[in-house]
Amino acid sequence: IFEIPMGSHFRIHNGKIFKKIALRVKRYECLEISSGRLYLFQPNAEVELLPN
């Protein structure tokens, strides 16, 4: 996740789609598109980048 640009959309293994927002100390704050909830991701989490 640390390799994708800020503001881009990505998908995790279970199909949920998120938008990368900000860096909080060591973890990345991301917004789930469908529910609007915020989640924190470890920098080495494997995600699939989606075209905007």
Region spans (language model):
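Structural motif
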Residues: 13-14, 34
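Mixed-charge, Lys/Arg-rich low-complexity intrinsically disordered regions
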Residues: 1-5
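Intrinsically disordered, low-complexity, charged/polar segments
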Residues: 38-52
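Short beta-strand-centered aromatic/proline hotspots
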Residues: 15-25
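A broad helix-preferring feature
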Residues: 7-10, 30
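Short, solvent-exposed secondary-structure boundary/capping segments
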Residues: 26-35
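Short, isolated positions in well-ordered beta-strands
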Residues: 10, 17-18, 39
